[in-house]
Amino acid sequence: MDPITTASTEFCLDVFKELSSNNVGENIFFSPLTTFYALSMLLLGTRGKSAEQMEKVLHYDSFSGVLKAKTKNSSECSQVGVMHPDFRALISHINQQNSLSVANRIYGTRSISFHKQYVRCCEKLYQAKLQTVDFELSTEETRKSINAWVKNKTNGKITNLFAKGTIDPSSVMVLVSAIYFKGQWQNKFQKRETVKAPFHMGVGKSAVVNMMYQTGTFKLAIIKEPEMQVLELPYANNKLRMIILLPVGTASVSQIEKHLNVKMLREWTNPSNMVEREVDVHIPKFSLSVKYDLNTLLKSLGMRDIFNVANADLSGMSPDKGLYLSKVVHKSYVDVNEEGTEAAAATGESISVKRLPVTVQFTANCPFLFFIWDESGNILFAGKFASP
């Protein structure tokens, strides 16, 4: 796993754990890739302590020395830019084979002048334009404009990102990220096999879901601690896949979350441990639409100064004083059905490859974690299905 993928995965799991602890028993769904990408675009113009805090939260600090060496003789864009031609290539590659739309944009007030170099770097490295707006005099018009742009970029799946009254006239900058993805399963589920079945949420609570079913050859790992099954469901191009972490036996999804970190996730999903088996797959058909205001979450992770008008250092973005990040909003949509997915976001001893039954039962009738990622390990989406 390359440094960028490692950093984005670390960031993904940090955000996931914060969202989960703040939304106990609720569904979680977001796109770490677009959030990471958008914040990196902001980092281009951040300096001083503000930049140090952001680098730490984004896990760039662990390999920034290598990047500084690479960019020592370069004045065109900051060191962060060196990292992200890979992101552009990744999104371009995915877009060739799947319907993927990423919406990242910084909206800045017209009263602030922005460095031409920063604007140039955003366009060059992130294919994103900085949009100047009038928050103070045209608050409602600006809100509608942002919502319309996001709706267009996500094929109409994400609407009303900002509800009426949620954008303050005193705002100076708003960072927006949204994503839309539609992929077909390599092995589709047959609609005639979908039946009503119970989904157990714990503590005596259950609900009825539409449970999809198919038998096929899939990659599967059996983990002993915490006890779970790890199933890989590939998409039609075989470049992207959904990974489901399902607790079994007496284990719960919260136990999986406690053990979840980059090292463990790599170990659980290592191709050498994912054995091809004949599997009876039962997974619920579901759709989620989730919106998060990430200000508080990012502050809790350590990115504090950027939100404070007195402390934010965005001098790489603008010569004007008083520029700070007003709001970070992220909204994602996912629809998992028989055709595929539509989305707008230990030690080696823990792996068991012991003898398994000829056909393994994989029945997702309780809360589980799921990730959609590419062949390089970049996580496009992360989620938890806990409440139908």
From Swiss-Prot:
Superkingdom of source: Eukaryota
Positions of the record's site feature: Reactive bond: 354-355
GO molecular function annotation: serine-type endopeptidase inhibitor activity
SUPFAM superfamilies xrefs: Serpins (SSF56574)
Location of the region described as RCL in the Swiss-Prot/TrEMBL record: 338-362
Keywords per UniProt: Cytoplasm, Protease inhibitor, Serine protease inhibitor
Record flagged with keyword Cytoplasm: yes
Tissue: Expressed in eye, lung, lymphocytes, thymus, stomach, uterus, heart, brain, liver, skeletal muscle, and in day 7, 15, and 17 embryos.
Entry GO terms, CC: cytoplasm; extracellular space
Primary location class: cytoplasm
Location within or outside the cell: Cytoplasm
Stored Pfam families: Serpin
Function as written in the Swiss-Prot or TrEMBL entry: Inhibitor of serine proteases. Has moderate inhibitory activity for trypsin-like peptidases, but also some activity with cysteine peptidases, cathepsin L, K, and V, and the serine peptidase, tryptase gamma.
PANTHER family xrefs: SERINE PROTEASE INHIBITOR, SERPIN, SERPIN B11
Family recorded in the similarity comment: Belongs to the serpin family. Ov-serpin subfamily.
This protein's name: Serpin B11
Lineage, broadest ranks: Eukaryota, Metazoa, Chordata, Craniata, Vertebrata
